[in-house]
Amino acid sequence: MTGVQTCALPIFKELASKVESGGKPVIEDQAFREKLAACEIELKALELTQLRVVADEGKHGKGKPNPASSVLKIKGSEIQQTTTELLMEVIGPFAAPYDVHGDDGSNEAMEWTAQIAPSYFNNRKVSIYGGSNEIQRNIIAKAVLGL
């Protein structure tokens, strides 16, 4: 789950250094950099948690799932959604590159942006499929907290 996001973040940084918003590259926006840094930190924490879960795999009863897998699912889906949100923020108005009646053509979109918005909306489902994040939290509450 972390591989795609790990590969995508450097690409997002490069795009953010090329795409301008308000006359300056998006990467120079302090709020954007803070969101990007938070996403990178969350991604690194998820990678380390995955390694711990794999290392501890033999400690759980045979056939019993590790409750930490629910944590991985929740955090992984949240990070996946965050990365697509960051990409949407980078491309800004280019997210809708289609000609609109009366458009003077001044908003020339980059060709690749046509797939970004559909991908963003498609990725909203990741917190639902495979068991919603709320269900995963209930699993954690029962297995770990005994609630």
Predicted regions and their residues:
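Single conserved hydrophobic/aromatic residue that forms the stacking wall/gate
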Residues: 1-7
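Alpha-helical interface subdomain recognition
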Residues: 8-147
